[in-house]
Amino acid sequence: MKKKFSWGIPVLGTYVIYLVLVLLGFTRGLHGIGTAALFERNATLMTPMTYAFYGIPVVTVIGLVLMIGQLAPVRGAGERSYEGMQWMLLGSNIVSIIWILTWHFEKKIVAFIAMVLLLLFLSLAYMSALRYTLERRRATWMRMILGIWIGQTIFLTVESLSSVLRFAGMHTESNQLYGVLFLVLATLVTLLYTVGQREFLLGLVSGFYMFGVFMRHILVLRFNYVSVSIISLLMVGILVVSLIECVRKNLAKPKRCPKDRREEDTRKEDTRVEEKREAIQRVEEKPEVFQVKEEEDHVNPAQPS
């Protein structure tokens, strides 16, 4: 329990700080830019997602608490992957704080560097989580990670489609695309809640919200649609490949490594030795029973068939 507590406090604490800064940026602004003024200057931000963003702190904190709360103390197998994942989560939270502060104070270059580092940290965290799940197949919280991945993929797909159409000169409104997206999300929420996959549901919604903030605030406002299209499509490809690989490996029958085979052979040999020892002990405890049995076999030998 000590390892679990010591990891949970810094990871959750830094994430809460980041969420508070995001909420302040929405409501008051850290550089004299209020929420109303921000949306007045950027009419394309007025989508259904705008109102859903106010649920980010609650949904994401609940999801993170659930994910960390289900991580049992690790002993032996998977310990290195577990610690690596927690280091990456902690690093991504710290970078997120730097990113949101530099963006609000209009340090564009620093914010862009922090954005790239954030993607790197999160990618490494997901890779470590995947390795940990493959090593400890009872880690049910992996559904949370899969939900986050799928939530990001859904958002990036719609964002990429919108930016590509606009770059091609076609008139498109993000509101229409996000309207369809929210219908899809509403259907998934209803389905997942009905079948009881609440971990997966929280991961899906949290991933959609978190990456939605990232894309709309940094890429769309600070760069052009060409950059959005390239980065979004690249990320969609990476996430889809990661999901396919993750599902394939988790569904595949685990292969025994040479060390596992040696351990199994050792256990079988120990079992045979123990059975022989028990048989000898039974003979020593009741020798008369076995003596009578031998005499009967000598007097009445088995008839050949």
Where are these regions (language model features)?
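Alpha-helical transmembrane segments in multipass membrane proteins, preferentially the mid-helix core
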Residues: 122-131, 153-167, 181-197
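Membrane-interface helix caps and helix-loop-helix hairpins in membrane proteins
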Residues: 99-113, 166-173, 194-197, 218-224
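Internal transmembrane alpha-helix with an interfacial aromatic "cap," most often the third helix
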Residues: 61-138
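Membrane-interface capping segments at transmembrane-helix boundaries
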Residues: 72-73, 128-133, 243-259
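Alpha-helical transmembrane segments of multi-pass membrane proteins
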Residues: 15-32
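Central hydrophobic cores of alpha-helical transmembrane segments
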Residues: 200-213
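N-terminal membrane topogenic signal
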Residues: 1-11
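Short aromatic-rich membrane-water interface segments that cap or initiate transmembrane helices
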Residues: 40-55, 140-149, 170-176
